Amino acid sequence: MNRQKVIAIDGPGASGKGTVAARVAAALGYDYLDTGALYRLTALYAQKQGVGWHDEENVSELAKKLPAVFSGSRILLGGEDVSDGIRTEAIGMGASAVAQLPKVRAALLQRQRDFLTEKGLVADGRDTGSVVFPQAELKIFLTAESKIRAERRAKQIGIPCEGLAFERILSDIEARDEADRNRKVAPLKQQPDALLLDTSRLTIEETVKKVLDWYREV
């Protein structure tokens, strides 16, 4: 099978996968796919429709007809801008829940693959390198210490990196890590053919440069 013009980036929540992937895509002139957004959209859509996140049959049916549109940096669901709404920790937990459902993953698989064109693609999210794009030219497992990830998330939403609100963010991130590592379907783990990139002591710019350097070497 021929290699695919894809960079696949996996890793834990709040590790900066999306920011790094988007910047790498821009630098290369490739398209960008946030696969995690599709699961977040599915979780939000299910919530809006009154469907429980563990209801595999009904959630998978919603995933098949997900009325989502990616417009630049904005994400629309049924015509409503939900770019910020899908980024809450609660919806993140919902995304982790629906992503454990095999029928939901199957429903979204082809939709993810359809994003790949001759232009090239940078995709971030679980299973991007092992299942969605197994012949990707470069596969990366991007991670950082949980406290560092919590600090980055806190700065992103404008709260101090201390106090109860910060501790809640850290607790949520660690709980999600634990759930993702131990789930039966697509658990969080580095694949054998993926390069490990710990960004705990790296800036975004340094991380992007590292990814681009690796890609030029493949």
UniProtKB/Swiss-Prot annotation:
Q: Which Pfam families match?
A: Cytidylate_kin
Highest rank taxon of the organism: Bacteria
Catalytic reaction equation(s):
CMP + ATP = CDP + ADP; dCMP + ATP = dCDP + ADP
EC top class named in words: transferase
**Molecular functions (GO terms):** (d)CMP kinase activity; ATP binding; CMP kinase activity; dCMP kinase activity
GO CC, sorted alphabetically, is: cytosol
Chief subcellular location:
cytoplasm
Q: Which sites bind ATP? A: 11-19
Q: What organism does the record attribute this protein to?
A: Neisseria meningitidis serogroup B (strain ATCC BAA-335 / MC58)
Q: Which HAMAP family match?
A: Cytidyl_kinase_type1
Query: What's its EC?
Result: 2.7.4.25
Task: Please state which protein family the record places this protein in.
Answer: Belongs to the cytidylate kinase family. Type 1 subfamily.
Q: Where in the cell is it found?
A: Cytoplasm
What is the name attached to this protein's record?
Cytidylate kinase
Q: List the disulfide bonds.
A: none
Keywords assigned by UniProt? ATP-binding, Cytoplasm, Kinase, Nucleotide-binding, Transferase
Per the UniProt entry, what is one GO biological process? pyrimidine nucleotide metabolic process
- PANTHER family, from UniProt? CYTIDYLATE KINASE (PTHR21299:SF2), CYTIDYLATE KINASE/PANTOATE-BETA-ALANINE LIGASE (PTHR21299)
